Amino acid sequence: MEAIQVNFIELLKRSTATHISLAEELSELLKISLDSVYRRLRCETDITLSETFAICKHFNIPLEALAEINSNMVAFRINKLSNSAESFSQYLQVLHGDLNWMMKYPNHHLIYAAEDLPVFYHFFFPNLALFKMVYWNKSILNAESLQGKTIEEIQLPPTWLEEVPKVRDVFLKIPTTEIWNDDTLKSSIQQIKFYWEAGFFQKKETILAILEDLDGILAMATKQAAMGKKYNPIKDQYYDVEYSMYGCELMIGNNTVFLTSDTHQASYIGYNSFNFMRSNNRYFNESNEGWLRNMISKSTPLSLVAEKSRNQFFRAIYASIDKLRQQVLND
């Protein structure tokens, strides 16, 4: 039993911000003295089941995380989405909250293996952002309010528009390593093509503006890779935040994100098209980081001086966008 409590306390420490006094927080939460808290932290006194429930609820720790004592068991937190507008607002809030959570810890870094276009990029380009949020909610979540409408007829809920800049701004502040392959934009291009062929656009100008935003994303990624810094295309401004990019010829297989710092880590695995499930499990994080490092070692650097490789990589993706553009123009 003591081993489980030791494991739980270590998990608790990894789940709290460094500026928080854990002992004082627990004292207030459990309504016990600091001395009683320290006895629990030193495993001299057992943490009761009711106290465990209260702690897990307060610090957003799943009870299943106690299984971390067994390296073959992993607990995940998911964003439970429905077909309501409020549900997607919560998705954006969680996205923003998780990035802010990692920002609290020293030497934070984000590694993103992108089977699909990293979600953050959409939010810098309004036409593409509108399309993707409509696609996710209409076609994936089956939102009733969006059915039977074309893109031009849809107005996004104000709560979505309020959250998008928050996610965008925090992303610009986090040092990032991205792994792309030739198919990273393929799904977005296919989704746009499907909506065009299905009659969900009233005007060619709408889809052409979305394709122009895809060009803009490639320009943004190119500028970031060339300078090794984050870039905001809205303000045409570079940030002194590290950015590196790799082109991978291997099949990535799934969107995989690893948030790391000196003291805290979290892994995110994509599911249901655009959603993510998160784990703070130490063993899973070690495995995930090892896989990502291996993918990087087998990839081609596209940042800074790798101009030839960078140009070749993006040229092929530009060609895929232009192919759909010509199809629309000739239709």
Language-model regions: role of each:
Residues E2, T16, S89, K204-L211:
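Generic detection of long, well-ordered alpha-helical segments
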Residues S89-D116, T176-E205, D331:
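Short N-terminal signal/transit or membrane-insertion segments
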